[in-house]
Amino acid sequence: MRRTKLRFLWLSLATFVFPLWAQDSHPSCNKCSGTYIASDEIQAYLNRSPRDAVVTDQQVRAVDVGKSNVDIGVVYRNKTAGGAVAEHDLVSEVYHVIDGSATLVVGWDITDLKRRPADDRAVRLLNGPGGNGASIRNGATYQLKPGDVVIIPAGVGHWFTKIDDHISYLMVRIDPDKVTPPKDEAASKADLAGAGR
């Protein structure tokens, strides 16, 4: 009886478990290179942000990493007592606050949501299809300061309800559907030289 159980166990392992160990896993971005962005380049984008603009959202890189794009942006927002809610259908965002402070509300229950047109700059170049709304019901409120990080999944509204003086942040956009166009170092340098304005 005991031998029968042991044989059954080994047969089960040989049939189901061992083949799993033998499977090769392959990277989703075979032989891709890493991407480096110097702090001087980030600072150059921040320095060219007009201080009289309500918001300046600039794409620094958009990199194909296999099954997804990962984009890096720099955003500068001026003092305001509110603005529109933003929502992106396909692109998630991660904010890392560099400077300044603000109140950010995040949530999925967006009032008076209206779609952005397909030819909108943000839709074409930054974060794909989405919409803007009037407010967020029952959202989470965060008091952002330098060093803070916020993760905003695709489809979730985000709304700066108050910016004390200004806020600047590095943004990582996760774009699994590759809706944003690629932007490499050469394109970034051309952008900074004035060709992308």
Regions found by a protein language model. Name each.
Residues 1-6:
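N-terminal secretory signal peptides that target proteins for export/translocation
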Residues 8-20:
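Bacterial N-terminal signal peptides
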Residues 20-90, 182-197:
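A short, N-terminal "cap"/entry segment at the start of jelly-roll beta-barrel domains
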Residues 89-108, 119-132:
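Short, conserved beta-strand element in jelly-roll/cupin
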Residues 91, 138-139, 146:
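Short, solvent-exposed loop/turn positions at domain surfaces
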Residues 110-112, 166-167:
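Short, surface-exposed beta-strand-loop junctions and turns on beta-sheet-rich folds
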Residues 142-163:
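Conserved metal-binding segment of the jelly-roll/cupin
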Residues 165-181:
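A short hydrophobic beta-strand segment most commonly corresponding to one strand
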